């Protein structure tokens, strides 16, 4: 039930934006839930590790075969180091991320974030996300994972065009990188 599962609701919203037919979405939900004709047990696996220069990385994967997927993910960490569960999750906040824009370039983004139920916001420009038109007020709203759907609904009802909504990891501290 997407109303009870924020991750599923986000995936369904993303599929609808990409014009995926309703029957395909419903079939994928049944397949992932292990019901219907095509039973498939999908497993959620989180890989944690460090890229070169000690940059923390978290990779979330849904797979029907962990034994096949794990070596493929290890290849991504070949110049870094694949860690164990919990090795770097403390470096990140697991949050909901909603990116949107409003035609009024002078709209109060902070007030919109508060009203929508987001914890924080960051201004976004066309250079940062090409889905945001030039001259529009763009913002990335950061909220609790369970509040993504409510934030999207409020923004859409108040004149914002939602570009993306997803669950993700935001670093608590950004590392300094050099060439």
Predicted regions and their residues:
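Flexible, glycine/charged-enriched surface loops at secondary-structure junctions
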Residues: 2, 22-24, 85-88, 163-165
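Charged, alpha-helix-enriched surfaces in structured cytosolic catalytic cores
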Residues: 3-10, 19-24, 54, 68-72, ...
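Translation machinery proteins
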Residues: 4-61
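Signal for well-folded cores of large energy- and translation-related assemblies
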Residues: 12, 16, 30-33, 74-78, ...
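Flexible glycine-/small-residue-rich
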Residues: 29, 49-51, 59-63, 100-102, ...
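Active-site phosphate-binding and catalytic loops of NTP-dependent enzymes
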Residues: 33-42, 81-87, 120
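RNA pseudouridine synthases
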Residues: 45-96
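Positively charged, low-complexity, intrinsically disordered RNA-binding extensions
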Residues: 99-179
